Amino acid sequence: MVALSPSYRDGALSALAAREVDVLVIGGGVVGAGCALDAVTRGLTVGLVEARDLASGTSSRSSKLIHGGLRYLEMLDFALVREALRERDLILQRLAPHLARPVRFLYPLQHRGWERLYAGAGVTLYDTLARRGSLPRHRHLSRRGAMRACPSLRRDALIGALQYYDAQIDDARHTMFLARTAAAYGAHVATRLEVTGFLREGSRMTGVRVDDLEHDRTFEIRARQIVNATGVWTDDTQSLVGERGQFHVRASKGIHLVVPRDRIQSSTGLILRTASSVLFVIPWGRHWIIGTTDTDWRLDKAHPAASAKDIDYLLTEVNKVLATPLERADVEGVYAGLRPLLSGESESTSKLSREHSVVSPVPGLVVVAGGKYTTYRVMAKDAIDACVHNLARNVPRSVTDRIPLLGADGFPALWNRRGLLAAESGLHVARVEHLLGRYGSLVHDLLALIREDPDLGRPIEGAEDYLRAEFVHAAAAEGARHLVDVLTRRTRISIETFDRGVVAAPHAAELMGRVLGWTPSQREREVENYRLRVEAERASQEQQDDETADAARLGAPEVVPIRVS
């Protein structure tokens, strides 16, 4: 089994520097990782380069829903909803059943008569567009039935409700598994490689120049086709080409709050109507995720900041339906992400296109942008189709609708055997369920680590939901190069603990350092860098507007590379 280990990265760099690849993908988000998997499973030679970490941008900061998007039905975008629902069902049933799971939602109704008919017709159409039998169909609930499912609702906030199902996924882990699966099929995947320029022969793009941010060196990568899959950085990447793009990407900021599960008594998620969009209250393990906002963002793209105004808006909206209002002190975590929207005529980002676009502005280069997280596979397929057309040779069609990700194979059987796995490993069955939901059939790799060192079977200090083995595994197999990679993406400690992961940080650094060969001073540097990041984020969340929040967030240093000579 291919692991995204330090030695794997060294080999990937050597391979990329030594020979031309058929397709080079720029961007390690969900679309870029999807492009790499699509291309390599067609029999092409593939490289993927990412300037920071896998899923370090938008792909770790979504609402973590795999869904069709009920609000797009109101926009009469039936094709987008149908496509997204088809992809949702593929992910749930075939591609990543270990990472995705159904989630139930209530939509409270506030008006008698017309609203139940109107909303009911919409959810009926939503169910109809989905594949029959993939998830339970919607139900109408009385006020009593809705209050039974969600006792925390204010009685005067609803006259009844609709219940329907969608799905959720840990977006960052899903993206990492996409990249790791691509590597298992032969793609060369390397993070901390920043593209600084394009190579050109005449009018044709023939490769890129990259800076290795870990080793402080520069080299060139040659490719027959290059895919720009850099999301909100699409225009920035295109500027390196020196050619005007055929479309532009605007960033829309969406923030989310995380609160403990006991703050809202409910067995179901909520979807609430707001003046401009919808608001989700999403079950997330022992927590709730509340979001999102939809506002234009023209500041730092690497570290979008949530302001106090953003946070207060979400609390105000959700408190309209809660019997016991949430307060700022209830908020464990806050995260902000940027949606890459194709520019349109409207000034409102909520009305910009969620469709995706694929173009080839110059020979040798394909650009893919826009879209939704759920439809990443279709975006990747379309981008690689364009590459194949430009390669002008016979290449098989996409097969990613039939390629389960690593960890998916045998997952249902392992889930049924979770009690036996618990007995064999000495772990509580709840721990085994946690591991299965994060690693699937790769759980055996974690259990092997614990057999070799039983101390790794203990929870990490400061974040008891996670075992110490997970931090060793993240550095050894999941491509984590820095402490922030593990605390914010391989795990979600940064948003699931009130201290934002500061207590767990030194313990995580010690475990990662065993794999990555960190000296005591290097460990201290990683921990201090993470502490400053948390301080800067907290400071930004006290500011009243985007500009001051952005300035406060930029007070933290970037990742301190572990330089290797």
Model-derived regions, located:
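Extreme N-terminal leader/targeting segments of oxidoreductases
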Residues: M1-V23, D38-R42
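Core beta-strand elements of the Rossmann-like FAD/NAD(P) dinucleotide-binding domain
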Residues: R19-V21, H215-Q225
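C-terminal accessory subdomains/tails of enzymes that are appended
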Residues: E20, R52, H98, H111-G122, ...
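Short hydrophobic core segments
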Residues: I26, I221-G231
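Glycine-rich Rossmann-fold phosphate-binding loop(s) that bind the pyrophosphate
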Residues: G28-G29, A51
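Glycine-rich FAD pyrophosphate-binding loop
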Residues: V40-S60
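Dinucleotide-binding Rossmann-like beta1-alpha1 core, especially the glycine-rich loop
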Residues: K64-A149
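A conserved short coil-to-beta-strand element within the FAD-binding core of flavoproteins
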Residues: T191-T206
